[in-house]
Amino acid sequence: EPAPVKPLHMDEETAEGAAASVYYFLDLYRYAYMTGNTTELEAMSENGCKFCRSTIDNATNLHNAGGWNDKWEQEVTNVRYYEKLEGYDYNRVEASVSHQMITSHPGGGVATETSSPTKNELLDFAVRHTNGRWMIGGVRVEQQ
């Protein structure tokens, strides 16, 4: 599976750049579980991002055990950028994510697992522009 392509203007310090970074992060998230390659995901994740660290660790552990996830279809909609509030270090980007069923092959002789599709799951990203690129400082799944 080829690595996701970086969107044009992704590194610009604009609302469009921040939104493009979120799209790219979500593509890298899927790519990490499919291939075990977390290099680009790590490069755009701040150290304090628990969601990012968990994703990197889980994808790495899955692949170290000989497992992988099949590619799944995902749709990202309603991406909204919010200017950072005075006194805060991060801008906010909100996105609705829907995905088809995910099939995981854990490896080590463990049976294949599937997860249910989701529809319009709301994700809240804390992003900031640092050293010429957008970094992900945190991701929260909103309870609906």
Enumerate the language-model features and the residues they cover:
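Core segments of small alpha/beta cavity-forming domains
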Residues: 1-70
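Residue-identity detector for threonine
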Residues: 14, 35-39, 55, 60, ...
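N-terminal short leaders/motifs
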Residues: 28-38, 76-93
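A short, amphipathic edge element
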Residues: 64-82
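Exposed beta-sheet edge and beta->alpha loop/turn motif
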Residues: 83-144
